[in-house]
């Protein structure tokens, strides 16, 4: 269970570091989602992200300290050159579209294809329909996105960075899933050691940033209703 909604203590011991990337078209609200989660801020004057930036937030999951390292890059085509470095070591991804702009949802399969080409094959992915506060401007029915997420084996939520709806839940869903996968791997390694098998990770701090090896759960368990 995720707890400790604070924004981190510099002196706190870190048990895990999870790299999560935000991807999607420009102006869907990726930077706003990150600002809301990392600093609980929202600015109507937010400018397009140029290049790459990342922010961190430390939280507690099952009594373990987890640092989320969240990367954000602009969605314009001219920044595609950063992709391989951007995706390297990521164990979670947030695939964001704007519920008021149909083309941003239509581009999601392309973003997903790029993600799967560059990232670890077992990366934990959540599809996010942002700007859910703009109900009267909705262009993508929730059911369409939910159906796509189920077909592709993704988590799904609709969020609003403006009023903070489901922003915490979206990050919590991804980070908790990664944590559970890592814990299962650690437990399996510990059992191997007890059985005299080599290659155990027991007793070691597991830093996930260099490269994951998760197993995605069954699709039937992966879609989170908004």
Curated annotation (Swiss-Prot):
Q: What is its main location?
A: membrane
Output the Gene Ontology terms for molecular function. Answer: GTP binding; GTPase activity
Which Pfam family, any one of them, does this sequence belong to?
Answer: Ras
Keyword tRNA processing in annotation: no
Where does this protein have compositionally biased stretches of type Polar residues?
A: 217-226
Q: Which InterPro entries match?
A: P-loop_NTPase, Rab_GTPases_membrane_traffic, Small_GTP-bd, Small_GTPase
**Is Transferase set as a keyword in this record?**
no
Domain of life of the organism encoding this protein: Eukaryota
Q: Name one GO biological process term.
A: cell wall biogenesis
User: Which UniProt keywords are present, listed alphabetically?
Assistant: Acetylation, Cell membrane, GTP-binding, Lipoprotein, Membrane, Nucleotide-binding, Prenylation, Protein transport, Transport
Query: Which NCBIfam families does the record cross-reference, listed alphabetically?
Result: small_GTP (TIGR00231)
Regarding protein family, the annotation reads:
Belongs to the small GTPase superfamily. Rab family.
Write down what this protein is called. Answer: Ras-related protein RABA4a
Q: Which organism is it from?
A: Arabidopsis thaliana (Mouse-ear cress)
User: Species lineage, top-down?
Assistant: Eukaryota, Viridiplantae, Streptophyta, Embryophyta, Tracheophyta
Tell me the gene name. Answer: RABA4A
């Amino acid at each position: 269970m995720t707890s400790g909604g604070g924004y981190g203590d510099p002196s706190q011991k870190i048990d895990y570091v999870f790299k999560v990337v935000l991807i999607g078209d420009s102006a869907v609200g990726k930077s706003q989602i990150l600002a809301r989660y990392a600093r609980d801020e929202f600015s109507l004057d937010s400018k397009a992200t140029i290049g790459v930036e990342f922010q961190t937030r430390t939280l507690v999951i099952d009594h373990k300290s987890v640092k989320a390292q969240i990367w954000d890059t602009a969605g314009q085509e001219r920044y595609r050159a950063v992709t391989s470095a951007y995706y390297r070591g990521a164990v979670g991804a947030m695939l964001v579209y704007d519920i008021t702009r149909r083309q941003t949802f239509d581009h999601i399969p392309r973003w997903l294809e790029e993600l799967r080409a560059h990232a670890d094959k077992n990366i934990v992915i959540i599809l996010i329909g942002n700007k859910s506060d703009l109900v009267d401007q909705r262009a993508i029915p929730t059911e369409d996105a939910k159906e796509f997420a189920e077909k592709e084996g993704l988590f799904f939520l609709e969020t609003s960075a403006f009023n903070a709806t489901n922003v915490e839940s979206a990050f919590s869903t991804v980070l908790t899933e990664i944590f559970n996968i890592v814990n299962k791997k650690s437990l399996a390694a510990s059992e191997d050691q007890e059985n005299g098998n080599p290659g155990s990770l027991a007793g070691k701090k597991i830093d996930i940033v260099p490269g994951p090896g998760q197993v995605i759960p069954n699709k039937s368990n992966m879609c989170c209703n908004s």
